[in-house]
Structure formats: structure tokens, C-alpha cells
């Protein structure tokens, strides 16, 4: 019973989003932060972007990311951190719409997006992080 209610709320939020959207490309190799369990330096860098305070719906609109050289190990989520709101300490974004609140009185706040893996070097593909403003 609870899942249909949550799905209905997310669907309602998605249907009330503005026409303008922001798309950010996440690269499975270049934007991969290597897991702290694996010795050695971190592999890639996060993607930084700024959003004005407000409510957003985020999802992966396209995704071809995989690990182990594309041999079936699908990477189906990206992490979003920052914004002084609901993603302040991090949230996971998949193909399912996720509501993210960006708070503060600042005109724009920085958020970062990345994936994590224990071995980033064999990752391939990209995903598009779609960000839509909720009216």
C-alpha cells in the first residue's frame, strides 16, 4: 500500500515540473571515486554543478554505464551530495525520479555527482543526470 502512494506522489511531482531541465553527463570512469577499501589513490573526480534553492526531481534519463569492461556489471546509480538540503550528506539517484531539496538563502549552491567502485579503471559508458525544477 505504501509503495503505490509514494509512486503516486513522485509521479505527481514529475508531472508538475517545469519544461526547462538541466542535464549533466556522468562518465563511469572519469567521474568514479574509487572505494576506500581498495588501496591506492582515488581514480576520478566528481562533477560539480550549481542549483538555486528549491525542489528538484532528479533521475538518470539515459544510462550505458557498466563495470568490468561492459561485461554485464551494470552501474545503475549515481550519488549526489551537497546543496544544504535533502542531499546535504548524499542521496542516490537512479532511473526512478528522486526528489531533492536544495536549501539556503544563497543564490546558488554547489552539488557534486559521482559513482563509486572498488576498481574504476575498467568502467565504461555514461549516464545523463536529468534535473527538473518542481513548480
Mark where each language-model region is.
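N-terminal signal peptide c-region/cleavage motif recognized by signal peptidases
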Residues: 15-17
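Hydrophobic helical h-region of N-terminal Sec-dependent signal peptides
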Residues: 6-11
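Acidic, Ser/Thr/Pro
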Residues: 20-135
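Positively charged n-region of N-terminal signal peptides that target proteins for export
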Residues: 1-4
